[in-house]
């Protein structure tokens, strides 16, 4: 699939929108992602596989949202959030395709658990492990981006106008 065209379609339909203040919400979204992941782990350990499945997906959702916010966009569709991850991060070699595939699988398992009462220990485990990988990578990417931005803002740190001096 051509993710650039699909990204443009999401923008045209207003399922993705630019939002200048989004960059100020990155930390908040990442905190929500971490909280959801902790809840998913606790639920799994208690045998609450339905809630673990759901919380694991939402951990990934909020992690992806933090990444999207870091680029100045806001999603209005779970599907377009996935499209944005593929276009803005996978297409540039920052995220592996499998991480977004896992997020899409997690969304399907979340929908089954939430709307059809169809869930299992195996599905909960899959979502939980996928969420751990996704959140770890999101944190890495956001930490690197924050450090680069911080260095550009403070030239004495060894960066000037985006280049090492």
Regions found by a protein language model. Give the residues of each.
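Terminal alpha-helical segments
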Residues: 1-165
């Amino acid at each position: 699939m051509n993710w650039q065209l699909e990204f443009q379609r999401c923008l045209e339909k207003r399922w993705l929108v630019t939002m200048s203040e989004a960059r100020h919400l990155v930390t908040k979204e990442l905190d929500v992602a971490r909280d959801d992941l902790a809840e998913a782990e606790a639920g799994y350990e208690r045998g609450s596989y339905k809630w673990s499945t759901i919380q694991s997906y939402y951990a990934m959702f909020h992690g992806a949202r933090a990444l999207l916010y870091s680029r100045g966009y806001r999603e209005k569709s779970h599907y377009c959030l996935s499209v944005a991850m593929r276009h803005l991060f996978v297409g540039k070699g920052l995220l592996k395709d499998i991480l977004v595939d896992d997020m899409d699988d997690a969304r399907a398992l979340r929908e089954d658990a939430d709307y059809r009462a169809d869930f299992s220990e195996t599905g909960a485990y899959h979502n939980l492990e996928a969420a751990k990988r996704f959140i770890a990578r999101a944190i890495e990417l956001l930490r690197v981006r924050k450090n680069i931005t911080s260095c550009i803002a403070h030239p004495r740190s060894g960066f000037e106008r985006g280049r090492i001096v």
